[in-house]
């Protein structure tokens, strides 16, 4: 039901409705779009960001946790892992594109160089309705997109150094095993600490990085019980990292 996976699904099924889940070889890249959050164009240092500033998302009204994740770009990191698993794609085929207008919800580039994109008003009712009415597209209460009013669309590369949470998510995706579960748990603890003004905005990735470095490697497929255990252990480890302040030594 999320707008980006829904957009990718629509692009894939438009090309091949029955075998979309087996199209990894025909896909060159997935362009996973992100609004960039409230700090996409901010030039000032992010170390001084307050919870109140980080909660001012320019496009979407969401809960506090996911709004902070959008500000750090971790939410897009989670979505990247989601896309890799949903559509059986390697990490190298998923590319993040900062798109402040949130008009293109994602796009698929095929091996021939053609790009299929799904566009629409930035309104979550659209993907939710499509999930309910699939495969039909029914009339919607959402206001139609006026391309003349939109006028222009912007696309920018993400800055992985300025937003290290995104880089950590891709590292966790490459490592696989227990790392994605640990990533999620550590982020949850770090964001909560930031909202309580216990750490700085730029400390969020440091906490996550410290936890990931202490997470044991694991080969093979992870079952639900193992993922749940990894989540619990990473949660406890993140709390310990906050208490002993070892995250302050992290160099990302």
Question: Which sequence ranges carry the predicted segments?
Answer:
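Catalytic, metal-anchored helix/loop core of enzyme active sites in primary metabolism
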Residues: 1-252
């Amino acid at each position: 039901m999320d707008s980006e996976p829904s957009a990718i699904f629509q692009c894939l099924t438009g090309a091949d409705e029955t075998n979309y889940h087996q199209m990894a070889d025909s896909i060159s890249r997935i362009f996973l779009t992100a609004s960039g959050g409230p700090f996409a164009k901010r030039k000032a240092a992010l170390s001084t960001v307050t919870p109140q500033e980080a909660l001012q998302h320019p496009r979407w009204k969401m809960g506090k946790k996911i709004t902070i994740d959008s500000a750090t770009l971790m939410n897009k990191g989670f979505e990247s892992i989601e896309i890799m698993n949903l559509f059986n794609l390697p990490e190298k085929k998923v590319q993040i594109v900062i798109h402040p207008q949130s008009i293109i919800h994602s796009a698929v580039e095929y091996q021939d160089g053609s790009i299929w994109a799904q566009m629409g008003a930035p309104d979550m009712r659209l993907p939710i309705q499509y999930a309910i009415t699939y495969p039909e597209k029914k009339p919607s209460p959402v206001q139609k997109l006026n391309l003349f009013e939109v006028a222009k669309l912007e696309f920018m590369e993400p800055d992985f150094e300025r937003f290290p949470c995104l880089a950590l998510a891709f590292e966790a995706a490459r490592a696989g095993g227990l790392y994605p579960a640990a990533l999620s748990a550590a982020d949850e603890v770090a964001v909560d600490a930031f909202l309580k003004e216990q750490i700085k905005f730029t400390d969020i990735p440091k906490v996550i990085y410290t936890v990931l470095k202490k997470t044991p490697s694991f080969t093979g497929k992870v079952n639900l019980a193992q993922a749940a255990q990894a989540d619990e252990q990473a949660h406890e480890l993140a709390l310990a990292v906050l208490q002993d302040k070892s995250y302050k030594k992290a160099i990302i």
